[in-house]
C-alpha cells in the first residue's frame, strides 16, 4: 500500500507543527496539505520550515476542498468552528478525519456523528496510549467503588489553552460516569465558588489549572471515608499526541464508515 497522504489542519499552530514533524518522521504517511484559517498571517508559508524542518514545498492554504482532492485523511486539532467546517468537506471527499479538537458542544458532536454513516471519523479528547489506558482503569474503579467514594478530576495545562475542562478531563469524567452508570451531563460539578453548600453525593467534580507550558497533567481521585485513591497521567511533550493522531489515521485508512475512538485504535474498547 502506498503512503497515506495526510492534511494537517491548523498547520501554523503548535499542535499543527508537531503533526507536521510526526508525519515527516513516520513510515507510511506523507504530508499532502497544510490548512490554515482564512486571513492567517501564516498563509503561503512553507509547512516544513514552520515545523523546524527543511522546506517541503507544501504551502499553508485556506482551501481544504482543493488540497483534499489528492488526500487520504486530515488530522484536525483546531477549534470547534473550524472542525465543523472541515467535517462536511472531509465526508464529501471520503477521506479519514482524525479529530482531536476539544471544546466541542453537544450540537457540534451531533454534526460529527451525522456524517459517520458515510465517513470514517476517529475522535478522541486525547490520542495517547497512557490516557486511554487510564480511562479504561477509571471506568473499572468507578464501577468497583460505591458512592461513598467521591470522584474529583484535576487537570493542568499551559496558559494558552482556551477551553476548560480539557477534553481529556471530560473523557475521564465520561469513563467514571460510565462506570457508575450515570450521565456525566447530569452529575458534573465544573466549578465551585462562594457558598456552594455540601458536595452533592454522586457528582463528579472538575478543577482546571492554567499556567506555564504544561502539555497536560490529569488526575482522577476517588475519595472515600477512610482512604483515597488517585490515578494520574503526565504528558511530557505534545509530540505524544501527534504520534497518536498519526497512528489513528493509519489505523483508520481503509476502515468502513463509522465513528471510532482511540480505544478502538488501541484495542481497548472492550477493557
Swiss-Prot record:
Entry's Gene Ontology cellular component terms: cytosol
Binding residues for (S)-2,3,4,5-tetrahydrodipicolinate: 158, 167-168
SUPFAM superfamilies referenced in this protein's UniProt entry, alphabetically: Glyceraldehyde-3-phosphate dehydrogenase-like, C-terminal domain (SSF55347), NAD(P)-binding Rossmann-fold domains (SSF51735)
Key words of the record: Amino-acid biosynthesis, Cytoplasm, Diaminopimelate biosynthesis, Lysine biosynthesis, NAD, NADP, Oxidoreductase
Any GO molecular function: 4-hydroxy-tetrahydrodipicolinate reductase
PROSITE patterns: DAPB (PS01298)
Cellular compartments annotated: Cytoplasm
Membership in a protein family: Belongs to the DapB family.
Function: Catalyzes the conversion of 4-hydroxy-tetrahydrodipicolinate (HTPA) to tetrahydrodipicolinate.
NCBIfam families per UniProt: dapB
Stated name of the protein: 4-hydroxy-tetrahydrodipicolinate reductase
Protein source organism: Bradyrhizobium diazoefficiens (strain JCM 10833 / BCRC 13528 / IAM 13628 / NBRC 14792 / USDA 110)
Lineage: Bacteria, Pseudomonadati, Pseudomonadota, Alphaproteobacteria, Hyphomicrobiales
